[in-house]
Amino acid sequence: AAVPEAAAEATAEAAPVSEF
């Protein structure tokens, strides 16, 4: 399921910095 950019940003803020 593709999540909108807004949700991705919110998830990035809440989740730890691991994607970078």
Swiss-Prot record:
Give the residue ranges for region: Disordered: 1-20
Keyword Secreted attributed: yes
Reading the lineage from the top rank, the first entry is Eukaryota
What are the record's GO terms for cellular component? extracellular region
Subcellular compartments = Secreted
Indicate the quaternary assembly.
Homopentamer. Forms a cylindrical structure with a central pore.
Q: What is this protein called?
A: Haemoporin
Organism expressing this protein natively: Aplysia californica (California sea hare)
